[in-house]
Amino acid sequence: MYRPTTTSYSPVYTGNPLYDISASQSDPRQRIRKNVRFQTEVDEFPDFDDSDSDELQFENRDPRKRIDPIKHMLLVQRLKRVSTSSRRLFIFTLSMFLIAFILLIAFVSFRD
């Protein structure tokens, strides 16, 4: 395999991908940066732990998996509405049972 000498390289490129600096972002020889999230792969172990994480459990760092804040806000508002209506229905049902129980006690006591 033919390998050009270092003098034939542009001064920007050393031939070592760890130290090459690309002339443009789209250059395929773009410098490989170490310890940059989403650019280097994380070492995964069989139990989904990763080597460079301080946490015990592997955390998926993919930004596409993050929750959309607007969807989350709308979901929380909907849950609040549902919980409020459920609470009102529960209180109404409980009060109806209490009134029926009081009427039953009154009916039984007046019958004697």
Swiss-Prot record:
Modified residues (Phosphoserine): 51, 53
Keyword Lyase among UniProt keywords: no
Compartments it resides in: Golgi apparatus membrane; Endoplasmic reticulum membrane
This protein's name: Uncharacterized protein C1795.12c
One GO CC term on file: Golgi membrane
Spans through the membrane: 90-110
Topology of this chain in the membrane: Single-pass membrane protein
Record organism: Schizosaccharomyces pombe (strain 972 / ATCC 24843) (Fission yeast)
Major place of residence: Golgi
Keywords: Endoplasmic reticulum, Golgi apparatus, Membrane, Phosphoprotein, Transmembrane, Transmembrane helix
Superkingdom of origin: Eukaryota
